[in-house]
């Protein structure tokens, strides 16, 4: 069968255009890794901050993955929070040493709009970079939940800049 050079050029142009569109889309999409430090005695504050975002992400066709240390998500809580029960997955009783590794693998797949993991210790620079790369690759969000007790919150030194009042008088 004979095909004209024009027809061949047209099909190669469309495949090149789709490749350029895919590359430009990949370059403009970005993931996000964020650490959320919250007081264990005030979990409602964290819910007030994160629930609107999680509800919005629940409108996507992708899953939400919760990597929880011990607690199991309550079906009633998920529904009452306005999260899509059919899109929420949970893995519980995951040891902290496997949480970062599991988050990286899940974020990289692109199957999850958000991956939430609980860690008591700070991330190393290498772990953070690995999570950021995975979130960018999967165009997903990752939240590291870091609980602090009320007593440690009251005794730790706050980081910030102290402005002396004599600068203003």
UniProtKB/Swiss-Prot annotation:
Region (Lon protease binding): 162-169
Residues with site note (Essential for degradation by Lon protease): 169
Any single Pfam family the record assigns to this protein: SulA
Region of interest (FtsZ binding), residue spans: 106-112
InterPro entries reported for this sequence: Cell_div_suppressor_SulA (IPR004596), P-loop_NTPase (IPR027417), SulA_CellDiv_inhibitor (IPR050356), SulA_enterobact (IPR047696)
GO BP field: division septum assembly; DNA repair; negative regulation of cell division; SOS response
Induction of synthesis: By DNA damage, as part of the SOS response.
Protein modification: Is rapidly cleaved and degraded by the Lon protease once DNA damage is repaired.
Domain of life: Bacteria
Keyword list, A-Z: Cell cycle, Cell division, DNA damage, Septation, SOS response
NCBIfam families, sorted: PRK10595.1, SOS_SulA_coli
HAMAP family: SulA
Task of the protein: Component of the SOS system and an inhibitor of cell division. Accumulation of SulA causes rapid cessation of cell division and the appearance of long, non-septate filaments. In the presence of GTP, binds a polymerization-competent form of FtsZ in a 1:1 ratio, thus inhibiting FtsZ polymerization and therefore preventing it from participating in the assembly of the Z ring. This mechanism prevents the premature segregation of damaged DNA to daughter cells during cell division.
Protein family: Belongs to the SulA family.
Oligomer status and interactors: Interacts with FtsZ.
PANTHER family: BLR3025 PROTEIN-RELATED (PTHR35369), CELL DIVISION INHIBITOR SULA (PTHR35369:SF4)
Protein name: Cell division inhibitor SulA
Origin organism lineage: Bacteria, Pseudomonadati, Pseudomonadota, Gammaproteobacteria, Enterobacterales
């Amino acid at each position: 069968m004979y095909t004209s050079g024009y027809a061949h050029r047209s099909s190669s142009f469309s495949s090149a255009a789709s490749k350029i569109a895919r590359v430009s889309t990949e370059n403009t999409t970005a993931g996000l890794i964020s650490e959320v430090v919250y007081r264990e005695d005030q979990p409602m504050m964290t819910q007030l901050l994160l629930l609107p975002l999680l509800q919005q992400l629940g409108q996507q066709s992708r899953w939400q993955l919760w990597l929880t240390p011990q607690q199991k998500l309550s079906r009633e809580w998920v529904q009452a929070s306005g999260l899509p029960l059919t899109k929420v997955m949970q893995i519980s009783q995951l040891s902290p040493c496997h949480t970062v590794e599991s988050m990286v693998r899940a974020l990289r797949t692109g199957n999850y709009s958000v991956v939430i993991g609980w860690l008591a210790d700070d991330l190393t620079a290498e772990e953070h970079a690995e999570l950021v790369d995975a979130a960018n690759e999967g165009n997903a969000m990752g939240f590291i939940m870091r609980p602090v007790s009320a007593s440690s919150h009251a005794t730790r030194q706050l980081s910030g800049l102290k402005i002396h009042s004599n600068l203003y008088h």
